[in-house]
């Protein structure tokens, strides 16, 4: 197989990954010839590897005498058990001058805001003082109901600076979704923006904020700001708590205070999607998340100081945490809040050109949407600084690789990356010193013993199986919130294979040492006892111009499972019988006869999580007349109605 892109030798030699390969080779008197050998060293010599990159990345903190305690235990291993570090300190206290740009924030109204490093530090200082006056201490929880703007970053860094725990939900969460999350984690302080705008529609969040503050007895203080509509609110004065306006930057900044927390001290609570019950509250540490995210930025993305790093995300998705960690590399992070198509397909690309982004991160769904429009970057849009496009959220189709290189930019590193909320980082991602192969994630992340297991727990190559990690790594969660004996934590990741992290993705390792993800394990189809990943079907179906997107489930029928394919058609397109035949032929030609759906049904929309992922399990439940456990976790629960009592499915 030929690569679709290869790095130039000059680029390889100047990369941080190449620098690390040479450093580890030199310091350990060995010769690591390529990325595969560097990766093998990183998982076979964990203590040396994590100590080396701590120093090489310039992290501020104390390592302690031991780099890894109980390496044979999973869970149970501890990285830097004597170490002390603070996530926020590493993002704020370095040699970036006060007049440099730390944050550029955009929203769909066209508003552009810049925060210098000095303004960011002064703003965090003011917010830190407000939290202290509210009685916030280490290990208290601060909850953000916030859009992706500077206020969210300021509040999070101030929270982390005190050793308190930051947890956030985006404005697309309704009251029940917020209570399902904050009701478990019991924040002491709520930080909230009163309005947002999405797809040109203003949304007033005041009533939701009042409701959650009334319901959450743990909340003693509400810190609020106007949001996009710039209207000051007075309704909060009636709440049985202290209501404060978001503070202005400090004019007489003293030296910022940072709690030197243990490496394993909790920093973030992130939430699972909650589509199978109440969301899991996943606890991540200062040290584990910081060292993992900075590693990904500096080596896997080759991010440098002063470069512009963008990822399209909300504060309810782990990619927001991933993005703000870019400050620790002294990069400028770019925020965008609103619809990525508010001004058409060019919306984000125009900002990319104006702001000189180096890294453009987005979702596979977004790239697919551009591809469906056959949009291409205009000739006058040179995008001179852009050198990497990152995609995540779902598998990036093989055809989307072609689209990026043919229609968006031909000389970029296209990194399909994958991990999850569970590890607030990636298992597989880009590698600037390796070639890109169509449809593949370039490789496993440094320090991560990623493998594919068959049903018996044996490693397999070029064969589909369970994505696992066989050795501990720093970004493993501390555990779940309110799970003192870690029973739920162990059940979630370590029951399938003893002492091995099972991630829940159905994947394979390729001959090029890359990876292909075929879908979620719990959504795998099983007709006639043969396991089929849904992504294999979606890839074929979404090549049809008439079809916007697809979702496949296995329907139990006559003591077997039949594959049912649901498609959303483009406007003014119909699912004709001849189109169904074409779909079946293409799937059969490019996969196997087992992949061919027994039924193909047109629906108006597919249900999605709040982070935009389609939910096969919820559809499967509706089709089998089973209850959907947590509709509040869906962005559009009304879409489930389209799957009820479909005549074809009753036959």
Give the ranges of each region predicted by the language model.
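AMP-binding/adenylate-forming catalytic core of the ANL superfamily
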Residues: 144, 169-195, 353, 473, ...
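Conserved pre-ATP/AMP-binding loop-to-beta segment of ANL
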Residues: 101, 224, 237-271, 278, ...
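Conserved AMP-binding/adenylate-forming
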Residues: 299, 387-514, 521-524, 537
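Conserved AMP-binding/adenylation subdomain of ANL enzymes
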Residues: 290-308, 318-358, 373
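Structural core segment of the AMP-binding/adenylate-forming
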Residues: 158-244, 347, 355, 363-364
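Adenylate-forming
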Residues: 189-208, 229, 337-341, 357-403, ...
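Conserved AMP-binding/adenylate-forming core of the ANL superfamily
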Residues: 37-41, 88, 103-157, 174-179, ...
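AMP-dependent adenylate-forming
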Residues: 26-30, 88-116, 230
């Amino acid at each position: 197989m030929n690569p679709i892109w290869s790095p130039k030798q000059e680029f390889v030699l100047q990369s941080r990954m190449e620098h690390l390969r040479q450093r580890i080779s030199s310091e350990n008197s060995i010769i690591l010839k390529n990325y595969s050998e560097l990766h093998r060293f990183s998982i076979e010599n964990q203590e040396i590897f994590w100590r080396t990159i701590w120093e090489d990345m310039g992290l501020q903190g104390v390592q302690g005498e031991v780099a890894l305690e109980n390496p044979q235990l999973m869970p149970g291993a501890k990285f830097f058990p004597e170490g002390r570090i603070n996530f926020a300190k590493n993002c704020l206290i370095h040699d970036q001058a006060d007049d440099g740009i730390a944050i550029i924030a955009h929203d769909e109204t066209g508003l552009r805001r810049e925060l210098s490093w000095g303004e960011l530090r002064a703003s965090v200082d003011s917010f830190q003082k407000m939290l202290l006056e509210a009685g916030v201490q280490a290990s208290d929880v601060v909850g953000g109901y916030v859009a992706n703007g500077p206020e969210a970053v300021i509040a999070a860094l101030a929270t982390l600076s005190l050793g308190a725990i930051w947890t956030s939900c985006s404005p697309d969460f309704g009251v029940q979704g917020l209570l399902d999350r904050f009701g478990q984690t019991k924040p002491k302080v709520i930080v909230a923006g009163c309005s947002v705008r999405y797809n040109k529609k203003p949304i007033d969040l005041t009533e939701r904020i009042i409701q959650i503050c009334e319901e959450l007895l743990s909340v003693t203080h509400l810190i609020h700001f106007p949001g996009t509509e710039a209207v000051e609110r007075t309704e909060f004065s009636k709440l049985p708590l202290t209501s404060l306006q978001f503070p202005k930057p400090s004019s007489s900044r003293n030296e910022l205070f940072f709690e030197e927390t243990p490496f394993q001290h909790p920093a973030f609570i992130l939430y699972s999607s909650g589509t199978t019950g109440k969301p899991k509250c996943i606890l991540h540490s200062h040290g584990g998340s910081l060292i993992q995210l900075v590693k990904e930025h500096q080596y896997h993305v080759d991010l440098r100081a002063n470069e512009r790093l963008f990822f399209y995300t909300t504060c309810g998705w782990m990619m927001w945490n991933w993005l703000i960690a870019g400050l620790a590399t002294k990069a400028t992070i770019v925020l965008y809040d609103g619809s990525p198509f508010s001004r058409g397909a060019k919306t984000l690309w125009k900002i990319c050109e104006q702001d000189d982004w180096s890294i453009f991160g987005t979702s596979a769904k977004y790239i697919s949407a551009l591809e469906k429009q056959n949009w291409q970057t205009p000739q006058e849009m040179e995008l001179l600084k852009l050198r990497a496009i990152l995609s995540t959220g779902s598998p990036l189709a093989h055809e989307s690789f072609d689209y990026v290189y043919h229609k968006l930019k031909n000389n970029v590193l296209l990194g399909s990356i994958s991990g999850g909320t569970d590890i607030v980082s990636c298992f597989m991602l880009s590698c600037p010193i390796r070639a890109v192969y169509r449809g593949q994630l370039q490789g496993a992340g440094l320090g991560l013993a990623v493998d594919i297991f068959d049903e018996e727990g044996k490693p397999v190559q070029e064969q589909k199986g369970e994505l696992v990690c066989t050795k501990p790594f720093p970004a493993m969660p501390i555990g779940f919130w309110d799970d003192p004996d870690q029973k739920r934590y162990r059940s979630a990741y370590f029951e399938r294979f003893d002492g091995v992290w099972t991630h829940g993705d159905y994947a394979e390792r390729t001959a090029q040492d890359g990876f292909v993800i075929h879908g979620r394990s719990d959504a795998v189809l099983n007709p006639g006892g043969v396991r089929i990943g849904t992504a294999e079907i979606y890839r074929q179906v979404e090549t049809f111009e008439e079809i916007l997107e697809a979702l496949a489930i296995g329907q139990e029928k006559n003591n077997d499972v039949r594959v049912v394919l649901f498609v959303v058609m483009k406007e003014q397109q119909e699912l004709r019988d001849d189109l169904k035949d074409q779909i079946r032929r293409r799937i059969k030609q490019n996969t196997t006869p087992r992949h061919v759906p027994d039924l193909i049904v047109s629906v108006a929309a597919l249900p999605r999580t709040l982070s935009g992922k389609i939910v096969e399990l919820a559809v499967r439940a509706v089709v089998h007349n089973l209850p959907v456990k947590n509709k509040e976790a869906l962005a559009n629960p009304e879409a489930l109605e389209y799957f009820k009592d479909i005549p074809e499915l009753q036959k």
